[in-house]
């Protein structure tokens, strides 16, 4: 009762009533609209990733054209004729005791055997490259699965393909973290966070070293032709080393196929992804005012090598990217700028 009374407050006019309705109007659907209703897909990133995987799968799958079938049929007929003629020559040489002709037949058989063996080896390596895309799809399915039993077998197969020994600390931590009550999604997620980063770290180091060598070579060398040859050789070597890290043995045709897939992946991603990864701070640093033209060209070549390595890493990994574990081009850019500043 000791509190003073508050003064009276007078308003000049009446209170304004909000004329806008607080609730939206009712929306009803008839039977035809209800039957044709389809929910909207909100996950655009997964849709884009699915489009990229579809393009990669189409590129990996050989095109069965009529000319290809005719060529393969002709080669098969020619091979059968060569084998039949060789058998006939060998029988005639044995009957006539023509040891020179018999030696020539033996040499021809060795050459044909070596050729067939190389073709089979190339086909096996190319098939292994195609299987990596299917393994990535299987891993994506397991990451959304609530079943049990398949995840551990799948991860053990990946570790064996990558050459990870059973006594490796990362693999031992993974074995200690899993138990029988976990489903396939949890088992594969643990493998992706405990074992897979070991290979990813080695691939990142290879990309950083190749990008730095390309940057310094372009910044120092005055010969453009030598620069182009060096960059091409380093990029091919980088793709080979990344594929070897992830347990993929490349032959001649599989190496060309992987290089084609990397370039196709870069072209499919477009320039928007490049701008998003590099960021707007590229222009804000005003490199042209502080570095020479050759140094700026070297940084551009290094970024191209790094982007090539990232895409090769993405195609050779047996697991899809989870959370934010995908390497960013901006991280390599900062390293390249620092190395150029220290060198020049």
Curated annotation (Swiss-Prot):
Signal peptide location: none
Subcellular location field: Cell inner membrane
Ranges in a coiled coil: none
Residues annotated as transmembrane: 70-90, 100-120, 213-233
Cytoplasmic compartment residues: 91-99, 234-344
GO CC annotation: plasma membrane
SS bond list: none
Membrane topology reported for the UniProt record: Multi-pass membrane protein
Alphabetical list of InterPro entries matching this protein: DUF697, UPF0283
Keywords for this protein: Cell inner membrane, Cell membrane, Membrane, Transmembrane, Transmembrane helix
Segments in the Periplasmic topological domain: 1-69, 121-212
Pfam families: DUF697
Protein family (similarity comment): Belongs to the UPF0283 family.
Protein name: UPF0283 membrane protein YcjF
């Amino acid at each position: 009762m000791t509190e003073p009374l508050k003064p009276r407050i007078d308003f000049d006019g009446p209170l304004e009533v909000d004329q806008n309705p607080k609730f939206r109007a009712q929306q009803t659907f008839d039977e035809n609209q209800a039957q044709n209703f389809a929910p909207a897909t909100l996950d655009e990133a997964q849709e884009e990733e699915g489009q990229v995987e579809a393009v990669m799968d189409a590129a990996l799958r050989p095109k069965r054209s009529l000319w290809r079938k005719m060529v393969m049929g002709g080669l098969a007929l020619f091979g059968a004729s060569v084998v039949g003629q060789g058998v006939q020559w060998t029988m005639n040489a044995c009957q006539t005791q023509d040891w020179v002709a018999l030696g020539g037949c033996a040499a021809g058989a060795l050459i044909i055997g070596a050729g067939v063996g190389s073709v089979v080896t190339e086909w096996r390596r190319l098939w292994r490259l195609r299987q990596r895309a299917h393994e990535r799809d299987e891993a994506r399915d397991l990451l959304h699965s609530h079943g049990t039993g398949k995840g551990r077998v799948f991860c053990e197969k990946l570790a064996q393909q990558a050459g990870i020994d059973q006594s490796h600390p990362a693999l031992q931590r993974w074995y200690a973290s899993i138990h029988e009550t976990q489903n396939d999604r949890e088992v594969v997620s643990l493998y992706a966070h405990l074992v897979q980063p070991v290979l990813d770290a080695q691939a990142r180091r290879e990309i950083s070293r190749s990008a730095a060598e390309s940057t310094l070579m372009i910044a120092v060398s005055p010969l453009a032709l030598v620069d182009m040859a060096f960059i091409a050789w380093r990029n091919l070597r980088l793709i080979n080393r990344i594929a070897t890290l992830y347990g993929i043995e490349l032959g001649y045709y599989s190496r060309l196929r992987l290089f084609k897939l990397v370039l196709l992946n870069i072209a499919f991603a477009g320039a928007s992804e490049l701008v998003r990864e590099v960021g707007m701070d590229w222009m804000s640093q005003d490199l042209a005012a502080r570095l020479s033209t050759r140094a700026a060209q070297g940084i551009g070549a290094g970024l191209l090598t790094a982007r090539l390595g990232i895409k090769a890493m993405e195609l050779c990994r047996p697991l899809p990217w989870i959370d934010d574990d995908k390497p960013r081009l901006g991280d390599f850019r900062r390293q390249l700028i620092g190395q150029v500043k220290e060198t020049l």
